[in-house]
Amino acid sequence: MRCIECDAADVSERRERTTRGYRRFRCRACGKQFNERSGGILNRAQYPSDVIALVIFWRLRYKLSLRDLPEMFLIRGIEFSYEAVRDWEAKLTPTLIDNLRRRRTGRIGKSWYVDETYIKVNGRWCYLYRAIDRSGALVDVRLSEKRDMAAAKAFFRSAKAVTGITPARVTTDSHDSYPRAIRTELDAGVKHRTNQYLNNRIEQDHRGIKGRYGPMRGFKSHESASRFCRCFDELRNHLQARSRRSRNLPTNARRHRFSDPWDRRAPRSGSGLITGSAVSLDPPQWRDR
């Protein structure tokens, strides 16, 4: 533990804890007193970090509306409003996106399948650009108000920056913007394929966000829509069980991968997917406080 004021490592732990059970510390260098959650994105939150992390996990993983989550937690005696869920989502999802993206940098295949689907934002249809590799792993997601050359270039530029990889093959539909965008943002030597049957893989993969998007009945703003779509696909990709030859695994194997992938793949340095605070989406670290 380091001091949040002067970043000194010479800190001492105090005997007493906060009302929610967080450990307290004192910096010997500057005298600053702080606890486990000080300086983090949930520093002033009125609820335990583990409860907030579980709310956001269920919000992203399952088909629940903003009003469903408060009702589910009210049964356990935890009371909060749907506006609190919206606020927690806005605070935590950017950090979660960054952490999940860092975990898969350089691990994406070199055969990409790119397509766009429709998402309604504030009553208007927008284009959600998505890409996966041959094994079904997520490459990148980007929401755009238009379907043109600028949007295609921005998507490929973002995908290359996120993955750190230049693909060998890119399969798309026959839209006019793709050939030039691929040559400009990726490489002139990248093989571009436009067969509609070859691109059926990504079209089937749209079912994930389409199924989750249905109960929400659209988004109110472009910012919240972009943030949610990116975080949903990143978490879905992280938890999706895959085999080398087929994406269909036995039920027991899928359950094991879902309940215990964190011990093998997550860092054990005390910070989980959401760093900079005591929040962790790692299931073994969920505990009552």
Regions found by a protein language model. Give the residues of each.
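Active-site beta-loop-alpha junctions of metal-dependent nucleic acid enzymes
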Residues: L42-S49, D87-K91, V141-G164
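Mobile genetic element proteins and their domesticated derivatives, centered on retroelements
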Residues: V11, C27, V55, L69, ...
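Major-groove recognition helix of helix-turn-helix-like DNA-binding domains
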Residues: G21, F80-T93
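Helix-centered, glycine/charged polyanion-binding patches within enzymatic domains
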Residues: S174-C229, E234-N237, A241, R245-S246, ...
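C-terminal domain-tail junction helix/linker
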Residues: P215, S226-D288
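Short, basic alpha-helical nucleic acid-contact segments in DNA-binding proteins
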Residues: D87-R107
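Basic, short loop/linker segments at the boundary and entry of helix-turn-helix/winged-helix-like folds
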Residues: E16-R61, D87, R107-W112, M149-A150
